[in-house]
């Protein structure tokens, strides 16, 4: 238990306000809708909703749920980014229930585990996700079927009952160290406090347009969705898949006059490298969170755009983010990045391992208290008791949440220093290595596995160290071991949890206390993986300065085994059948550091990941003269498929082929036209 000892030096308290939200988030939105019923609340492509239409649609969702959803149980939401998503989520809140966003593309076993923990009985779906959720034993409700005609007259119905602000608003599942995901339950009051703070802190007004591009399974989506609706502004949805392409994000910002948006720092870095980014002059505020913001990225932003850049911090166990810091306007003034000060009605403490406050400037673990806190973990009182601990009688809060983050308190605010445990962030995704290790160890060829985050070039990448099971040494160094391990994990964890690199060792090193030496394994991985990186080409200062090594390098060779890329020995790469295929194959070989690339092999099975696609995009342009969108690269993941796409062109909305350096706006229209044709 943290002890204050009357020492407030390691305590930060945000502005204390009298937040009055008796009807929770639905009440705040209803007040705005009453004042501006005809104003545009949300837009996605050519589809838009007025505030009145949103109220009517979400009311229909709420009434349906009140008839069929058990009281108190989370309602699963599996609807892609769209106006229907907004109506679905608001309808759940109006029904007095928490929403549980899920990714229907998650492995079925993981999805089933989440649903079993949640106890959900009803799912809001669209036509694509209906079969997936119905197959999980849930009662599906199609949201689009509840949408009324745009010009339908208002029908007088009994008003829905008010929803207390103490009600849970949502459940967000995150990685669990025991191998099982855990669901964080956030009350509506915590969400309202976070939104009202942001409205006031950044002077958000009805004229603002806020970009919604974060997947709804991440809590940052919360402010992107709800902040516009409590201020009378407009929520602009980036269509599904387009959030993966920085050029299309820039296109949307320009097209819609976006004024506020969010990036994880690694995506902001890629965004700033696109020439389109410099033309995003409508931006007023850009927010970063999800991982540490590098000084170089903040400086690059300040040199390119007039908007203000803000670094936010917060775990899933508190309402979205709980600290804020604004970067200096001039690039030359940015010499360190802080996470800053607490938001309204938030209390932060910095304590040593014995629960004593640390002096200013010393390192300690960050604790969070006050209004932003979650209620705990869904149906896991044991985990809740471990992470949410009582404060002593002298404290200004009743409960602290132990973040596991190391910080120190400076005059200008808190500085983030790392973790006290093994949790990592990879491309904005929070991952407990023990969850991946748990599933690795269930593979018959693996005796033990340790997963670490290693710095490879500019990125942090997930690396799995493998100790082979007895009698499996030869199998793990020959015959497609990496492919088997990837396939094994792909059935159990989300794609972002599957390591980019697999390395083998006869024994995994231990510390003097007998624990696995993760620090040493991280260092060894970084030494090996970065040793294979070539020097940057002349004139590529604005690009990623080096390519990543192949994901399948086994760098700690077993006895009598050679060190080599695993799958190259298993598959004989089919020879390119034409010049275009040959050029695409050469681009892949350059990015993946392979001598041979099977033309039907999947990019992600060969060690690729989402950010490596940006490198492939540039390499393909150098080799073929054609610049494909990142969205197309995600949907065409073999050499053969990409070569066909380059030869035939990307069908546009007018029937012509979009190839070469097509404007991002035209590429976006082509993608939307293709999606519409597939729906029709």
Predicted region positions:
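Regions immediately C-terminal to embedded phosphopantetheine-bearing carrier domains
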Residues: 3, 160-162, 168, 511-513, ...
């Amino acid at each position: 238990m943290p002890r204050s000892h009357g020492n407030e030096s390691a305590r930060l308290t945000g502005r204390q306000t009298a937040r009055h939200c008796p009807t929770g988030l639905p009440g705040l939105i209803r007040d705005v809708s009453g004042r501006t019923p005809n104003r545009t609340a949300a837009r996605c492509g050519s589809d838009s909703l007025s505030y009145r239409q949103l109220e009517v649609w979400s009311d229909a969702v709420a009434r349906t749920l009140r008839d069929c959803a058990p009281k108190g149980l989370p309602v699963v939401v599996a609807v892609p980014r769209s106006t229907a998503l907004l109506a679905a989520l608001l309808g759940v809140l109006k029904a007095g229930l928490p929403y549980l966003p899920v990714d229907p593309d998650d492995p079925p076993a993981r999805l089933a585990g989440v649903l079993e923990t949640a106890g959900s009985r009803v799912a809001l779906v669209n036509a694509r996700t209906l079969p997936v959720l119905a197959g999980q034993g849930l009662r599906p409700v199609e949201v689009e079927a509840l949408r009324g005609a745009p010009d339908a007259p208002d029908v007088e119905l009994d008003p829905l009952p008010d929803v207390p602000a103490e009600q849970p608003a949502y459940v967000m599942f995150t990685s669990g160290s025991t191998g099982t995901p855990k669901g964080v339950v956030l009350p509506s009051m915590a969400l309202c406090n976070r939104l009202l703070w942001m409205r006031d802190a950044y002077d958000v007004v009805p004229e603002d347009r806020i970009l919604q591009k974060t997947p709804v399974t991440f809590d940052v989506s919360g402010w992107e969705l709800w902040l516009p609706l409590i201020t009378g502004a407009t929520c602009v949805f980036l269509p599904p898949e387009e959030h993966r392409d920085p050029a299309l994000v820039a296109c949307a910002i320009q097209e819609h006059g976006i004024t506020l948006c969010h990036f994880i720092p690694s995506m902001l870095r890629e965004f700033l490298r696109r020439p389109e980014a410099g033309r995003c002059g409508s931006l007023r505020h850009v927010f970063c969170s999800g991982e540490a913001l590098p000084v170089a990225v903040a400086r690059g932003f300040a040199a390119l755009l007039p908007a203000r850049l803000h670094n936010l911090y917060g775990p899933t166990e508190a309402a979205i983010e709980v600290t804020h810091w604004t970067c200096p306007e001039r690039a030359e003034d940015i010499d360190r990045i802080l996470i800053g000060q607490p938001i309204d009605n938030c209390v932060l403490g910095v304590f040593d391992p014995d629960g004593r406050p640390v002096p200013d400037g010393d390192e300690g673990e960050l604790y969070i208290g006050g209004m932003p806190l979650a209620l705990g973990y869904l149906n896991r009182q044991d985990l809740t008791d471990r992470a949410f601990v009582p404060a002593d009688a002298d404290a200004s809060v009743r409960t602290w949440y132990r973040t596991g983050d190391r910080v120190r308190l400076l005059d200008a605010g808190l500085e983030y220093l790392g973790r006290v445990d093994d949790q990592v962030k990879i491309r904005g995704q929070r991952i407990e290595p023990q969850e991946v290790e748990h599933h690795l160890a269930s593979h018959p060829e693996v005796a033990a596995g340790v997963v670490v985050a290693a710095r490879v070039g500019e990125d942090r990448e997930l690396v799995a160290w493998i100790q082979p099971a007895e009698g499996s040494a030869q199998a793990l160094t020959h015959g497609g071991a990496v492919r088997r391990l990837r396939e094994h994990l792909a059935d159990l964890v989300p794609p972002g949890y599957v390591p980019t690199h697999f390395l083998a060792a006869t024994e995994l090193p231990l510390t003097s206390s007998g624990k696995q030496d993760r620090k040493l394994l991280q260092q060894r991985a970084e030494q090996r993986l970065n040793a294979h990186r070539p020097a940057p080409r002349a004139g590529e200062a604005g690009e990623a300065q080096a390519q990543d090594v192949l994901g399948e390098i086994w760098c700690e060779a077993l006895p009598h085994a050679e060190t080599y890329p695993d799958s190259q020995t298993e598959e004989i790469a089919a020879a390119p059948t034409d010049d275009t295929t040959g050029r695409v194959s050469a681009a892949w070989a350059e990015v993946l550091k392979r001598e041979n690339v099977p033309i039907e092999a999947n990019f992600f099975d060969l060690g690729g990941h989402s950010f490596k696609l940006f490198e492939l995009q540039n390499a393909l342009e150098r080799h073929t003269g054609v610049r494909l969108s990142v969205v197309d690269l995600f949907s065409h993941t073999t050499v053969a498929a990409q070569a066909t796409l380059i030869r035939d062109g990307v069908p546009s909305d007018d029937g012509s082929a979009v190839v070469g350096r097509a404007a991002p706006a035209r590429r976006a229209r082509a993608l939307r036209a293709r999606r519409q044709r597939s729906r029709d």
